Amino acid sequence: MDHRTPTPDNPWLALRNLTPARIALGRTGTSLPTGAQLDFQFAHAQARDAVHLAFDHAGLASQLSDRGRESLVLHSAASDRHQYLQRPDLGRRLNEDSIATLRQHAQANPGGVDLAIVVADGLSALAVHRHTLPFLTRFDEQAAADGWTCAPVVLVQQGRVAVADEVGELLGARMTVMLIGERPGLSSPDSLGLYFTYAPKVGLTDAYRNCISNIRLEGLSYGMAAHRLLYLMREACRRQLSGVNLKDEAEVHSLENEDSANQKGNFLLGKG
């Protein structure tokens, strides 16, 4: 504090460089500084916009096609955004036209597949637009050697997490992966969530799903998310289950892990 800035120094200020969280905002009297208040209002507006942003399924389907991936565009039983937000149950099921489309595809491609990837707007189409393709690129790179068979990428408008169960059941998929926009936060309007289910069928609860959340540049990297998903897929097939009975114990190779492995004794007591 000096004569030019007559406010006390904030010892938390240096921590702002380490996180996008709203910490060390400062104060003016008993209130927030104007800048911090405006930033809050802007972040809140971004979160609201993310919820109501329309899902550009046509653009995403075109980008997938450019990368050699087939896609199917479907719709949940929620007719529009207003109904989707007020009736979560309708977002968990497909409409009749979409069910017919999947049945026709399954009849034309009998035998089922290992994996059905479903993409839905959820509560942030912005997250889906930004992160779906980069994640799938990294996933394909890491999964190439495993020989998984995949259904076309299914794009569901006004979809919620559980709609992937119906998609997987109709396609005869052993596993489903749902990529969906998470509820926006004040510092993360574009967070992508991933939900993995083994033996999908209508009526499963969240206890049968594994979640990998906050996939974005400022959160969990695409490569790490793909690494964890592949671990879950391998373990789910080996143990024939998913959800609360399947823990994410994927090994992550890093400098910190290597240092820990090489260090002997208790780190609290120093090197032995």
UniProtKB/Swiss-Prot annotation:
Reactions catalysed, as given in the entry: ethanolamine = acetaldehyde + NH4(+)
This protein's pathway? Amine and polyamine degradation; ethanolamine degradation
Keyword Acetylation recorded: no
Set out the biological process GO terms recorded for this chain's protein. amino acid metabolic process; ethanolamine catabolic process
**Gene Ontology MF terms:** cobalamin binding; ethanolamine ammonia-lyase activity
Q: Pfam families from the xrefs? A: EutC
List positions binding adenosylcob(III)alamin.
V161, E182, C211
Signal keyword on record? no
The Enzyme Commission number assigned here is 4.3.1.7
Q: Which residues form a coiled coil?
A: none
Q: What are the protein's UniProt keywords?
A: Bacterial microcompartment, Cobalamin, Cobalt, Lyase
Question: InterPro entries attached here?
Answer: EutC, EutC_C, EutC_N
Query: Needs which cofactor?
Result: adenosylcob(III)alamin
**Binding partners and assembly:** The basic unit is a heterodimer which dimerizes to form tetramers. The heterotetramers trimerize; 6 large subunits form a core ring with 6 small subunits projecting outwards.
Q: What does this protein do?
A: Catalyzes the deamination of various vicinal amino-alcohols to oxo compounds. Allows this organism to utilize ethanolamine as the sole source of nitrogen and carbon in the presence of external vitamin B12.
Matching HAMAP family, A to Z?
EutC
Spell out the family assignment given in the record's similarity comment: Belongs to the EutC family.
Name used for this protein in its record: Ethanolamine ammonia-lyase small subunit
Source species: Pseudomonas putida (strain ATCC 47054 / DSM 6125 / CFBP 8728 / NCIMB 11950 / KT2440)
